[in-house]
């Protein structure tokens, strides 16, 4: 597994949606979005996620907290925090796998704690980092290495490039 780097995401209640939108851009080979573009993409994704809940009501209503209509109405608000149900719906809206990572004590890289949208493949997922307290950041593979590992970096970069091109 490639080392991962975190891209700091603004904590404005949209962090989950910003992180997923950021990761989707990177996965598609686009440039990392600016803060203002992140906000716009996050709000668009949030609206589509709320619509996806309604579309999949029979499958989702049972695992949402409280009244379904109230929950969806709350999720449409720009500062409502998202969690596992929203990550699942993000994977459906985007048609992409999403992995949630979290650092554990003494680990160099965060470990995967949840996976969504595996029906869309397992290669090159959108990666988000959960801090354990409600905030999400975007994660992306880091191709930077020390001088001692440059040869391996070239190999990994070559492999990573072609695995992304095939996706």
Describe every region a protein language model picked out.
Residues 70-167:
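Deubiquitinase catalytic domains
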């Amino acid at each position: 597994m490639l080392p991962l780097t975190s891209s700091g995401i603004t904590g404005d209640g949209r962090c989950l949606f910003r992180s997923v939108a950021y990761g989707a851009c990177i996965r598609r080979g686009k440039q990392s979005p600016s803060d203002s573009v992140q906000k716009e993409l996050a709000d668009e994704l949030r609206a589509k996620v709320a619509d996806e809940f309604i579309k999949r009501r029979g499958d989702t209503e049972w695992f949402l907290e409280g009244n379904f209509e109230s929950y969806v109405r709350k999720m449409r608000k720009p500062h409502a925090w998202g969690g596992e149900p929203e990550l699942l719906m993000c994977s459906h809206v985007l048609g992409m796998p999403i992995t949630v990572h979290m650092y554990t004590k003494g680990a160099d890289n965060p470990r995967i704690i949840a996976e969504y949208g595996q029906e869309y493949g397992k290669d090159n997922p959108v990666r988000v980092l959960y801090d354990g307290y409600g905030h999400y950041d975007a994660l992306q593979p880091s191709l930077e290495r020390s001088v001692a590992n440059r040869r391996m970096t070239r190999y990994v970069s070559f492999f990573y490039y072609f695995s992304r091109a095939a996706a």
